[in-house]
UniProtKB/Swiss-Prot annotation:
This is Chaperonin GroEL 2. Forms a cylinder of 14 subunits composed of two heptameric rings stacked back-to-back. Interacts with the co-chaperonin GroES. Together with its co-chaperonin GroES, plays an essential role in assisting protein folding. The GroEL-GroES system forms a nano-cage that allows encapsulation of the non-native substrate proteins and provides a physical environment optimized to promote and accelerate protein folding. One of its GO terms (cellular component) is cytoplasm. Belongs to the chaperonin (HSP60) family. The keyword Cytoplasm applies. The keyword ATP-binding applies. Its main location: cytoplasm. It holds the Pfam family Cpn60_TCP1. Its EC number is 5.6.1.7. One of its GO terms (biological process) is protein refolding. ATP binds at residues 30-33, 51, 87-91, 415, 496.
Length: 542
């Protein structure tokens, strides 16, 4: 086992703080409508330009092991916020840095770290309660467009496309973002269905960058039982190979010898193939397989219907324009099913929704209806260069998550103002001791950080902006960094999803609390490089 280096107390916290500052300082320049770009070097291809906080955070790795630990813990804030809300990663990073800095000062002055953390947690709970109480439900499409525009760094075109996509496929519909082949950004709504089952083996992946399987114009075999050997499937497999089309197998499971054979065939290039598990369980699985069969004009291969696998012919297989399979979900786009049959099926599901008395069953039936009737919206992001397209696609992804979050939990005034206004919730907190009160005050100061940073990125003085905002008590009164004007932020369209603001604060406080209560750090000692050996015969006189 390699020797370890151990740091304690203030020494450990100082090193960790340096790492936190490096990462946070690189990320926070991207905050707000006037946020700057960060350029990331790539070992191959053009450098990547981004304003996405989590993309910047993921690229940072420091040489000093202890500093790197601080940076990696802060990176966790951005990643977690990104996973839960899909946006707000830069805000979360700025908040975490502010809480850690204030917390470290308090610990250095002799306060109890555990009481500080309890105070921080009490304050965060109070602020979250205040945010939830003031969140406003989204009432129309233009508000969705405004949320999308703000999250896409003020790009109104992106906001418009997202609002249009959500209007067409509904809030529950599937929206995907792709790179366009042209310079124009466009929206296309495709009939399709998505279910929550991914590929059974990563060897099926065809697009290594995105780790997903993309099958163009495939046949789809829908089988309700397990496949453990392929003997009975050989006739249909041979027919598919001769047709030159890819094949998607949807079955209860594909295991053992059958999966191994499919993987080997895929790797040898003889057969473009992928396999996924059937969605749902029990009777619901049968119904969902039937939905897929109707969507793709295929037949469910089921012994109940007297169809055996060895008797399957090509015309029993479903067809679709495209199938995209990721680690955890599968999307069937543009199935070959007839409109009359699809309409009949959706009418049948609607009738079942009317009849059912169980809330759970109703919810599941509505999910099936959305999948059959909702379709998939595809936003194709265009640009003049590859670098521009990638940067824009990052912003569209952020904006998509933000609009979904806004529909889920409502909206708040943007520009960091909602957090600033929620400070009043801290006045009524009762703490057990003075150290906890200091923990509450740490949060009181830290939640000004996003407003200050947005102002500084826009070339204004953060403390002056915060001072002016404090003069008014109206919850939605704030400073618009885009125009430099004060006023009602709802009216100006400067809004943030409540879920994004809430998640950013909770995740920041969670990781910052861990950093503040850290008393020792352990890392592997850097290896001493051995001196190079002396060349043979060096220094000899021949």
């Amino acid at each position: 086992m390699a020797a370890k280096e151990v740091k304690f107390h203030s020494d450990a916290r100082e090193r960790m703080l340096r790492g936190v500052d490096v990462l946070a300082n690189a990320v926070k320049v991207t905050l707000g409508p006037k946020g700057r770009n960060v350029v990331i070097d790539k070992s191959f291809g053009a450098p990547r330009i981004t304003k996405d906080g989590v993309s910047v955070a993921k690229e940072i790795e420091l040489e000093d092991k202890f500093e790197n630990m601080g940076a990696q813990m802060l990176r966790e804030v951005a990643s977690k916020t990104n996973d839960l809300a899909g946006d707000g990663t830069t805000t979360a990073t700025v908040l975490a840095q502010a809480i850690v800095k204030e917390g470290a000062k308090a610990v250095a002055s002799g306060m109890n770290p555990m009481d500080l953390k309890r105070g921080i947690d009490l304050a965060v709970d109070a602020v979250v309660g205040e945010l939830k109480a003031n969140a406003r439900k989204i009432s129309n499409n233009s508000e969705i467009a405004q949320v999308g525009t703000i999250s896409a760094n003020g790009d109104a075109e992106i906001g418009r496309y997202l609002a249009e996509a959500m209007e067409k496929v509904g809030n529950e519909g599937v929206i995907t973002v792709e790179e366009a082949k042209t310079a124009e950004t466009e929206l296309e709504v495709v009939e399709g269905m998505q279910f929550d089952r991914g590929y059974l083996s990563p060897y099926f992946v065809t697009n290594q960058d995105k780790m997903r399987v993309e099958l163009e114009d495939p046949y789809i075999l829908i089988h309700e039982k397990k496949l453990s050997n392929l003997q009975s499937m050989l006739p249909v497999l041979e027919a598919v190979v001769q047709s030159g089309k890819p094949l998607l197998i949807i079955a209860e499971d594909v295991e053992g010898e059958a999966l191994a054979t499919l993987v080997v065939n895929k790797l040898r290039g003889g057969l473009k193939i992928a396999a996924v598990k059937a969605p749902g369980f029990g009777d619901r699985r049968k119904a969902m397989l039937e939905d897929i069969a109707i969507l793709t004009a295929g037949t469910v291969i089921s012994e109940d219907l007297g169809i055996k696998l060895e008797n399957v012919t090509l015309n029993m297989l479903g067809r679709a324009k495209k199938v995209a399979i990721e680690k955890e979900n599968t999307t069937i786009i543009d199935g070959a099913g007839s409109k009359a049959e699809l309409d009949g099926r959706t009418a049948q599901i609607r009738a079942q929704i009317e009849e059912t008395t169980s809330d759970y069953d109703r919810e599941k039936l509505q999910e099936r209806l959305a999948k059959l009737a909702g379709g998939v919206a595809v936003i194709r992001v265009g640009g003049s260069t590859e670098v521009e397209v990638k940067e824009k696609k990052d912003r569209v992804d952020d904006a998509l998550h933000a609009t979904r979050a806004a529909v889920e939990e409502g909206i708040l005034p943007g520009g960091g103002v909602a957090l600033l206004r929620a400070v009043k919730a801290l006045d009524s907190i009762k703490t057990a001791n003075d150290d906890q009160r200091v923990g509450v005050d740490i949060v009181r100061r830290a939640i000004e950080a996003p407003v200050r940073q947005i102002a500084e990125n826009a070339g204004a003085e953060g403390s002056i902006i915060v001072g002016k905002l404090r003069e008014k008590s109206d919850f939605s009164y704030g400073w618009n960094a885009q125009t430099g004007e004060y006023g009602d932020l709802y009216a100006q369209g400067v809004i943030d999803p409540a879920k994004v603001v809430r998640t950013a604060l909770q995740d920041a406080a969670s990781v910052a609390g861990l950093l503040v209560t850290t008393e020792a750090m352990i890392a592997e000692k850097p290896k001493k490089e051995a001196a190079p050996a002396m060349p043979a015969g060096a220094g000899m006189d021949f």
